[in-house]
Amino acid sequence: MDNELFMNTEFPPPPEMATHFEHQQSSSSAMMLNWALMDPNPHQDSSFLWEKSTEQQQQQSIFDSALSSLVSSPTPSNSNFSGGGGDGFLIRELIGKLGNIGNNNNNSGEIYGTPMSRSASCYATPMSSPPPPTNSNSQMMMNRTTPLTEFSADPGFAERAARFSCFGSRSFNGRTNTNLPINNGNNMVNNSGKLTRVSSTPALKALVSPEVTPGGEFSRKRKSVPKGKSKENPISTASPSPSFSKTAEKNGGKGGSKSSEEKGGKRRREEEDDEEEEGEGEGNKSNNTKPPEPPKDYIHVRARRGQATDSHSLAERVRREKIGERMKLLQDLVPGCNKVTGKALMLDEIINYVQSLQRQVEFLSMKLSSVNDTRLDFNVDALVSKDVMIPSSNNRLHEEGLQSKSSSHHHQQQLNIYNNNSQLLPNISSNNMMLQSPMNSLETSTLARSFTHLPTLTQFTDSISQYQMFSEEDLQSIVGMGVAENPNNESQHMKIEL
């Protein structure tokens, strides 16, 4: 009662009562008394509110009972009440009962300061009927009080109505209310012509109106939507029809999918461009580092790995070609290299062949040295014997020459003596001449033989014995003949001999 008093008189209540009044959101009397505060002309006829306070209290109790009976009464859950039309029908039924309460209450013609004619014109008469004429008294009361359409603009009423079971018994997800025009002169039900939809769950309370929860859960949900997805339009509480909202959602989804596809295509194109640029950069680097491709028969390993420059690869190629030519020459020289494939095996064959050649050379050098030693020894002996024999023969010839000279001189002396004594010594001279001649012949023959080969001792003795035997016989014959011959013939024979 105190709260109603302060609300009707428009005086500010004490702070204790103000806080208590702010926390009383479940009582419908506080909501109804709040209508007086929204009066555009509060200072006009304030005494009228004092006079009507008792009547308002009675009507408040009747309104509470009617509202509780309406809430407790079951409603058929058919298809008519499942959409936005069901919500409008429910609100119209509620306001119609309130109008009946005003008509039955001693025919006062007012609902909380509202004239009977206004409530009847709103809900008792058809919607298409023209508005009845109003007098100045009812026009003043209409300006003084707040119309019934404040149900839709009051956020507290929406929150309290969401707690009742009748509003939560049916599914209102994704459904919106249609506009509800009410003929009241030239005025509509609301300035915007829309009625708010009440949701039963706390998650759907945020969808009632942007005025109730500005920047609340809905804004957070909007922020949590990732990029690239379609931007869904916020669900309006007063869209014309559910089909319109569904088509809008479909269009939004298509637009969002198209936008996401366009963004995805742009990203893919950018990634492909980046990959192409990277591939071109890598290709340029590889082209700069790698030398030109060698012929098929020659493969340069370092050039293929990219470890050598162009000049280095060319020098390496020339060097390897020279090595290959030398290896071919070795293959031709070494008999076993042609049958072997592979550089390692070729090198093994070459090494084995060279070692065998070294052994052969050593063996041949040793054999040659042994043969040369034997020949040198034989030649030395032969040369020494020749050197010894030549001077001996020279000495013998010199001695023979001297002997011949002496013999000739002695022979001349004998001839002189013979001439003097020709008769005494005829046989001696002849014998001397015969002895000298075979000796000279023997010496010449032996000297000639000494140049060819060295005579043996037995041969020399045999020749000497033969010479002695020959000389004795000759001497006897000569002596016998010389005695019988003529001395002139002897002298001639000696001259011929000499």
From Swiss-Prot:
Cited CDD domains: bHLH_AtBPE_like
Biased composition (Polar residues): 233-246
Region (Disordered): 1-24, 207-297
Pfam family, one: HLH
Organs and tissues of expression: Expressed constitutively in roots, leaves, stems, and flowers.
Alphabetized PANTHER family for the sequence: STEROL REGULATORY ELEMENT-BINDING PROTEIN, TRANSCRIPTION FACTOR BHLH78
Known partners and oligomeric status: Homodimer. Binds reversibly to CRY2 after blue light illumination.
Name of the protein this chain belongs to: Transcription factor bHLH78
Organism: Arabidopsis thaliana (Mouse-ear cress)
